[in-house]
């Protein structure tokens, strides 16, 4: 055991002891002994003791119905507490953030040694535009009630780390920790009802209020300090290197519960939260800025008064209060007069910047650069709308509206027209001054919903929105259709529209679609030199396998960047990544640096999904660290871009992509036993019972694997520890290339090409979380005997995959030898995750044995094991 993790293990041990004490008080000594016996058997099993492994299986098989839920809860709660301890450790004085070089320091050291002009560095920093898009993907299984308790636990651990605590203070904090552990144990960890889209949006607002709101100014102070220390420059007052956007309340793709009314409510709530936060800050500034000296500009504004800063800020405060009252009234459905309200960010910025200039010119820079500067920076990042709301809709839905409309107007059926005919019609109507929508036209409910959403956009402040994303975009007409619908409802601003390319085929055609769009003069005038394109990671990986999808994404980005350079466009690529490797997840810093050269010049936009929001932004200190990782990676990619890959590397990747895709599809699509095996050997069918997000798990209720969303697809394979979507196909391709005598070339690619190196590193992480004996146990206990050969084949492929990757990676004795922190983290969890897996198998067996009977104890325990394994894996989908 590594001594550097002694503090982590100490906190895990303390929290585990307190949980044990709580369980003992609630359920008695005998039950606690049973839990401890299961834990010891799991630990011994993990060390290879076959006899104890069988004892573990037998013990969990023999649990009575009454014991199922408390056993599941004990191990699930322990894993949640381990996550709390780990998140605290990562930012504690003994943790990773304090014992490794700060990402910004590391970057600036590199920049100072590079052959770059100071102006080049200044310009790149000032143009930095990173947009983190919070999404409501249903992968956060931990209840928000418990998340709040976990945050309080973290605060207690932080206090305990202080060196000068008195024994009384120490005892008080430890007592509070014990209270919180007790509260967690006596709280149901599974929410009883699915959250509504508005609930999801409110959770997003809470993340901003509690974590990102305090983190942004602290992060920008640190960035500003580094710039001054290294280059003698200041961050501009209006700079916003990091901004926040959201899909919560705007993403209606496959979610019938996100309606135009919901979007309107979320927009108002977002504004209310922003106004409330700024109101608190302005009130504090009124208290702070009691100075009497001011410049002539401010004096002319406020007249002869002894406290000019307070005078102007009180006016701002009163306007904010009035605005908040008006927004509250709107939310309650009441009519409000158009009073002098704060509706634009500039209305708030102008008086604050006036105060800032005055303080600076009167020799009070130290005061100007205090809280006032922090508020100005929050304003640059969040604005008076708090965040930018994206709208996402399936491309077919826009076509459906136009199809109904053209039939009503007796022009034919838009859906049956050729692409050229669609474009001709759309461009003609876009250029026309007369309205297309008849006043008395009554479309279907689905089409009316699309039109109503466009009306909400048209009637709202443009700054409240991010971009409009079209899922499954395949033709220029998909984009032009949205532009026409927005025009027809009176939208006066140019809403940025991004086609989303999701499948492997769509990614391969992305450049052709963009080329065709740019050949349309009307479209070029509309976009005004700025093009957004979204790259889908989840569905492309589900469609073609991780390795092939990764290469399709890379080539698509390269082609799109080449078009942008040729056409002199600012191209912003929007990355739809998930939390897991199989959905494009993985360490952010490496992922950014592995993108094609030039792909970050137009900014960086990425989704932050589900439980990853909590892991990356769940505490202000952790959020600051992740802001630094993103910032340093994007700056490095733009200022020190990786070299263009060698021609030989392209050839190898083309081959790897082709072989891995063929193999992946030969199993997932063509193997007749695959779907029955998937349904039997994973809890996929049972996942629908878990009230995670507001969105249904399938696009089409009666569809098979192809209609399953990427999240439950990944979630199911993560639960049974086979982790199949993240590796299937890769090893066959790698082995084929090695058999051609190109092993040294693969090793060269690993050492010199960030894209390929990141692929192998992500595979390593997946392999360490996968588990062959547990995957086998799911098969033998749950799948019919005729499906066992397929399971055996897949497990052998997993083992072959591990062997191939270890052969390619230099000087590796074991997986992740060069990343001890991740390795220790996974090792710490296994003795608690393994019993949940074994218990889950037993619960699935009991549930499926009597499908017509409802057993609340079994169902509830099953839900807890699903949540617990997700906590143990530290990701779901």
Swiss-Prot record:
- The residues forming the signal peptide are none
Q: Which UniProt keywords apply?
A: Carbon dioxide fixation, Lyase, Magnesium
Record's GO cellular component, any one? cytosol
- Output the Pfam families linked to this UniProt entry: PEPcase
EC category: lyase
Where does the record place the catalytic residues?
Answer: 137, 542
Required co-factor(s) are:
Mg(2+)
What would be an example GO MF term here? magnesium ion binding
What PROSITE patterns does this protein map onto?
A: PEPCASE_1, PEPCASE_2
Q: What is its EC number?
A: 4.1.1.31
> What's a GO biological-process term for it?
oxaloacetate metabolic process
Q: Which reaction does it catalyse?
A: oxaloacetate + phosphate = phosphoenolpyruvate + hydrogencarbonate
Family, similarity comment: Belongs to the PEPCase type 1 family.
Question: According to its UniProt entry, what is the function of this protein?
Answer: Forms oxaloacetate, a four-carbon dicarboxylic acid source for the tricarboxylic acid cycle.
The name this protein goes by in its record: Phosphoenolpyruvate carboxylase
Native organism:
Tolumonas auensis (strain DSM 9187 / NBRC 110442 / TA 4)
């Amino acid at each position: 055991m590594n001594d550097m993790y002694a503090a982590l293990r100490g906190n895990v041990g303390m929290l585990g002891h307190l949980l044990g004490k709580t369980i003992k008080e609630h359920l008695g000594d005998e039950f606690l002994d049973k839990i401890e016996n299961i834990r010891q058997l799991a630990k011994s099993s993990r060390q290879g003791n076959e006899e104890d492994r069988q004892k573990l299986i037998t013990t969990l098989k023999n649990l009575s119905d009454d014991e199922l839920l408390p056993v599941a809860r004990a191990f699930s709660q322990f894993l949640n507490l381990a996550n709390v301890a780990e998140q605290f450790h990562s930012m504690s004085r003994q943790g990773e953030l304090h014992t490794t070089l700060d990402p910004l320091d590391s970057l600036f050291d590199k920049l100072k040694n590079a052959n770059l002009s100071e102006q080049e560095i200044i310009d790149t920093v000032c143009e930095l535009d990173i947009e983190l898009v919070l999404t409501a993907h249903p992968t956060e299984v931990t209840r928000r009630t418990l998340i709040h308790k976990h945050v309080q636990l973290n605060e207690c651990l932080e206090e305990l780390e202080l060196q000068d605590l008195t024994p009384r203070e120490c005892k008080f904090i430890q007592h509070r920790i014990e209270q919180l552990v007790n509260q967690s144990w006596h709280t149901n960890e599974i929410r009883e009802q699915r959250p509504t889209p508005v609930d999801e949006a409110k959770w997003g607002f809470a993340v901003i209020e509690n974590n990102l709101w305090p983190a942004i100014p602290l992060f920008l102070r640190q960035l500003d300090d580094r710039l001054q220390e290294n280059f003698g420059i200041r961050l501009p007052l209006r700079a916003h290197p990091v901004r926040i956007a959201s899909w919560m309340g705007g993403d209606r793709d496959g979610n019938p519960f996100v309606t135009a009314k919901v979007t309107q409510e979320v927009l108002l709530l977002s504004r209310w939260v922003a106004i409330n936060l700024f109101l608190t800050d302005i009130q504090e500034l009124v208290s702070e800025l009691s100075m009497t000296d001011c410049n002539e500009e401010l004096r002319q504004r406020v007249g002869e008064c002894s406290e000019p800063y307070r005078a102007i800020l009180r006016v701002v405060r009163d306007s904010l209060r009035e605005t908040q009252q008006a927004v509250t009234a709107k939310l309650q459905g009441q009519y409000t007069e158009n009073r002098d309200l704060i509706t634009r960010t500039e209305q708030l910025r102008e008086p604050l910047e006036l105060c800032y200039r005055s303080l600076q010119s009167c020799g009070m820079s130290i005061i100007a650069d205090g809280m006032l500067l922090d508020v100005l920076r929050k304003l640059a990042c969040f604005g008076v709308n708090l965040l930018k709301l994206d709208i996402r809709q399936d491309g077919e839905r826009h076509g459906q509206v136009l199809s109904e409309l053209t039939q009503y107007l007796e022009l034919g059926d838009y859906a049956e027209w050729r692409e050229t005919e669609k474009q001709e019609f759309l461009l003609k109507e876009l250029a026309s001054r007369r309205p297309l929508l008849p006043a008395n036209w009554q479309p279907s409910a689905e089409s009316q919903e699309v039109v109503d959403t466009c009306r909400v956009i048209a009637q709202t402040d443009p700054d409240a929105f991010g971009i409009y994303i079209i899922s499954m975009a395949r033709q220029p007409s998909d984009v032009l259709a949205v532009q026409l619908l927005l025009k027809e409802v009176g939208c006066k601003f140019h809403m940025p529209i991004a086609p989303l390319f999701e499948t492997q085929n769509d990614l391969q055609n992305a450049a052709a679609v963009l080329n065709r769009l740019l050949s349309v003069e009307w479209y070029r005038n509309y976009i005004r030199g700025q093009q957004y394109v979204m790259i889908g990671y989840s569905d492309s990986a589900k469609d073609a396998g991780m390795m092939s999808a990764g290469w399709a994404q890379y080539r698509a980005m390269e082609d799109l960047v080449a078009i942008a350079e040729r056409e002199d466009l600012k191209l912003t690529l929007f990355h739809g990544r998930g939390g897991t490797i199989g959905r494009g997840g993985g360490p952010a810093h490496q992922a950014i640096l592995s993108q094609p050269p030039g792909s970050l010049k137009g900014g960086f936009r990425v989704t932050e999904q589900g439980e990853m929001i909590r892991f990356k932004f769940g505490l202000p200190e952790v959020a600051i660290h992740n802001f630094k990782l993103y910032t340093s990676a994007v700056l490095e990619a733009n200022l020190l871009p990786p070299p263009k890959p060698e021609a030989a590397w392209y050839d190898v990747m083309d081959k790897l992509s082709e072989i891995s895709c063929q193999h992946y599809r030969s199993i997932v699509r063509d193997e007749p036993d695959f779907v029955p095996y998937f349904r039997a050997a994973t809890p996929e069918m049972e996942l629908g019972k878990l009230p995670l997000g507001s969105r249904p798990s399938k696009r089409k209720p009666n569809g098979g694997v192809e209609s399953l969303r990427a999240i439950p697809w990944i979630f199911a394979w993560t639960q049974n520890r086979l982790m199949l979507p993240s590796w299937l196909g890769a090893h066959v391709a790698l082995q084929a290339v090695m058999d051609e005598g190109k092993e040294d070339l693969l090793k060269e690619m690993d050492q010199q090409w960030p894209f390929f190196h990141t692929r192998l590193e992500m595979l390593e992480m997946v392999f360490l979380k996968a588990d062959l004996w547990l995957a086998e146990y799911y098969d033998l206990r749950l799948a019919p005997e005729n499906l066992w050969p397929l399971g055996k084949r897949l497990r052998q492929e997993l083992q072959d995959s591990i062997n191939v990757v270890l052969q390619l990676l230099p000087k590796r004795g074991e997986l992740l030898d060069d990343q001890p922190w991740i390795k220790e983290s996974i090792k710490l969890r296994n003795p608690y995750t393994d019993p949940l897996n074994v218990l889950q198998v037993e619960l699935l067996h009991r549930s499926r044995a009597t499908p017509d009977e409802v057993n609340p104890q079994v169902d509830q325990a099953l839900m807890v094991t699903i949540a617990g394994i997700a906590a143990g894996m530290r990701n779901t989908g």
